[in-house]
């Protein structure tokens, strides 16, 4: 119920609706979407959360702190989510929506096991949280992940890390040759959102584009990059 109400709050709020990443999160945690997720992972065996999960959210991906928090809640954990100080201002509308829903009396139990914090680069603070957690979720570059993994956790604790990852895209020359200008523009808009909004730093942002020479007109490649340039202008 909490996440479904958060979804509704995000999708009807003008400030969060204007932010594509926040709106996408609101759409992702709709009740129907979560029920489908629960059905996919259904088990006849009883399952419990790990306990206290400490999340280090990345600085380069908007709204990702909300996804990692949501997964932590769905897994049955209490959660401490550290936001980068570089993200706090940009995430203000989504944070405000989250606070409004958490403050509702019916969600007191969720509020009691949810903390969102921010602090500057301070290994001593991070190490203190690591020493107290039952699960650690680390998002960041290889160096950040290695530094955090060197910080001791309780013997029973588990961790999940998301270090540097690289993606590429493969485009069909034949398929791109068949696109109308409108279809090409719509696809370029989506490519721009996936790639340039995060300066190619997201795990799914392609660092390399390969063209499959499967027919069609090679000139479609130039038309494609012109459409992408128009989106970036």
Question: Residues of each region from the PLM?
Answer:
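N-terminal Rossmann-like NAD(P)+-binding subdomain of aldehyde/semialdehyde dehydrogenases
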Residues: 1-51
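Structural signal for hydrophobic packing residues in well-ordered secondary-structure cores
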Residues: 3-14, 102, 106, 152, ...
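Alpha-helical scaffold segments in soluble metabolic enzymes
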Residues: 5, 97, 147, 186, ...
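Conserved small-residue-rich beta-alpha loop and adjacent elements
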Residues: 38-101
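Flexible loop/turn segments at secondary-structure boundaries
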Residues: 61-62, 145, 217-218
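Short glycine-/acidic-enriched loop or helix-start segments at secondary-structure transitions
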Residues: 65, 147-149, 220
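Conserved NAD(P)+-binding/catalytic subdomain of aldehyde/semialdehyde dehydrogenases
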Residues: 107-208, 213-215
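Internal helical hairpin/lid segments
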Residues: 217-233
């Amino acid at each position: 119920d909490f996440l479904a109400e958060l979804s509704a709050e995000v999708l009807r709020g003008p400030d969060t609706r204007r932010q594509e990443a926040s709106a996408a999160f609101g759409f992702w945690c709709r009740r129907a979407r979560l029920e489908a997720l629960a059905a996919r992972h259904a088990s006849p065996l009883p399952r419990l959360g790990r306990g206290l999960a400490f999340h280090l959210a990345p600085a380069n991906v908007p709204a990702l702190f909300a996804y990692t928090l949501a997964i932590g809640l769905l897994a049955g954990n209490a959660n401490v989510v550290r936001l980068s100080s570089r993200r706090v201002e940009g995430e203000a509308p989504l944070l405000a929506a989250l606070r409004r829903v958490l403050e509702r009396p019916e969600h007191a139990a969720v509020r009691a096991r949810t903390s969102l914090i921010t602090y500057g680069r301070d290994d001593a603070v991070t190490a203190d949280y690591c020493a107290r957690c039952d699960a650690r979720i680390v998002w960041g570059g290889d160096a950040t992940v290695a530094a955090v993994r060197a910080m001791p956790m309780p013997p029973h604790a588990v961790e999940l890390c998301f270090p540097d990852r690289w993606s590429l895209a493969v485009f069909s020359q034949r398929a791109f040759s068949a696109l109308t200008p409108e279809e090409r523009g719509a696809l370029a808009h989506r490519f721009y959102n996936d790639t340039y909004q995060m300066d190619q730093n997201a795990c799914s942002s392609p660092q390399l584009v390969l063209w499959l020479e499967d027919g069609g007109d090679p000139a479609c490649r130039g038309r494609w990059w012109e459409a992408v340039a128009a989106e970036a202008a």
